[in-house]
């Protein structure tokens, strides 16, 4: 191993949302002189406006820093910033695979949260060296000793020499950097071996094409190298290689252990698959690097342009977004009510919201979304098994033997005062109690098995409001279980509106149908004829509301006069309304589609 490689340290920062990960990254950048005072702004690495507004990290970023340590040597530090939210675990697992070590940041006031745990386990699976860092020690409510104890008890890491830091005040930054140099091992790999780079992210540039962020594991890549993608076998010629300091800067070559980017005039987005291995076309490596686990979407929903003509734009936007967001999956679908659109798969509700907002902002689209739903497993009477990701594709009742739905194992960390509220919520959501564990005197970890369908609606919002924001949630899929599920349809003026169809538990169907009919009655404008709204299961109507017709006062001109004259006019009006009802169509406003989403609130 050359001296240059021995002085490289690749690390990432793992933390729960709001524990100060991005601020710590800012301080590290500032301390190593990567940014001047003028360029310094809060959350430098959160470059998307959305990330700033919500105060969360969505995309991972990679930065190369030079640090002169106390031993007089200059080290190259590659910091890979990762998201902390449960929906973005995939982004986290990608960045962990590119590192040798991780800083585990824990808030000195809040202690360990559920997602901190999930990410730590990911790091341990990847054999990373973990350095505990206790942040926000300048807060009046900080209890660093209690938090150190928690790290030891819950995770089993030795936290006796955990670094005490206040990223905001800039305390303990140098100690953190020294610990990175001392504890994290340098990357292994041979610069002369056949090339193997792992793509851990990519983005699209209008001038240069698709740009891949890579971690070089073996070999060297430079301008002019002919490269080959191992999953597709396509070859390209490298036009530039470089590193981020945070701004992109060209370098002569990237060798084993380094992190940077490769530009190779790749026109097609699909050719730079995240998790793929790049090798030298002339001297290829024998086999690809152990890739990422293929990501499985948990939540599906339909995305439709408000104007039918926006379909092509939506497709292009999704193609471009897919490049930076490896977890997004979509396929075209049509709906009677909404026209042409896409069925999209997401990792969770936050991911769905973020994708929708990015489409609306970055690509200037107006979208309608349908209610989110999970994938159901239908066992048919003829022995076939079908997977249904859209309620309208559910086979007819007489063909269904049983329907299974995905269950998750949810771990909720909560202060002991709120245990009752959380248990009540889980019970309402058809949860099965598994275990309850006191981590510290005031903190409890509850483990429940819940149907995923109950979590994707508003479980997280409710959890936060019932625990005053103190609870944190992490969940993992544990498989399918048989449930009493039915398909609830909405008929409007006798026509089935497919976008409103949902699959619900039989016990909930009546209340759900009732609430939906009430909500739609308020949202759909009155027509010239009366419009019945019916909630049906199969052929059975379980709830009905009627939107009254707007009517003109046809008797206004009759002063006094015979009753039969008035009756004739009223009958004539009634006849007209009846004819209208047969041919009339009802315009459904955008809010009505959104109502399906917020029905539980």
From Swiss-Prot:
Keywords recorded for this protein, A-Z: Cell membrane, GTP-binding, Hydrolase, Membrane, Nucleotide-binding, Protein biosynthesis
Pfam family, one: GTP_EFTU
Residues in tr-type G domain copies: 6-188
Record-level GO cellular component terms: plasma membrane
UniProt-recorded Gene Ontology molecular function terms: GTP binding; GTPase activity; ribosome binding; translation elongation factor activity
InterPro entries: EF-4, EFG_III/V, EFG_V-like, EFTu-like_2, G_TR_CS, LepA_C_sf, LepA_CTD, LepA_IV
Known EC number: 3.6.5.n1
Lineage top rank: taxon: Bacteria
Binding site for GTP: 18-23, 135-138
Any one Gene Ontology BP term: positive regulation of translation
Subcellular location: Cell membrane
Catalysed reactions listed for this entry: GTP + H2O = GDP + phosphate + H(+)
Membrane topology: Peripheral membrane protein
Role this protein plays: Required for accurate and efficient protein synthesis under certain stress conditions. May act as a fidelity factor of the translation reaction, by catalyzing a one-codon backward translocation of tRNAs on improperly translocated ribosomes. Back-translocation proceeds from a post-translocation (POST) complex to a pre-translocation (PRE) complex, thus giving elongation factor G a second chance to translocate the tRNAs correctly. Binds to ribosomes in a GTP-dependent manner.
Membership in a protein family: Belongs to the TRAFAC class translation factor GTPase superfamily. Classic translation factor GTPase family. LepA subfamily.
NCBIfam families associated with the record: lepA, small_GTP
Entry protein name: Elongation factor 4
Taxonomic source organism: Heliobacterium modesticaldum (strain ATCC 51547 / Ice1)
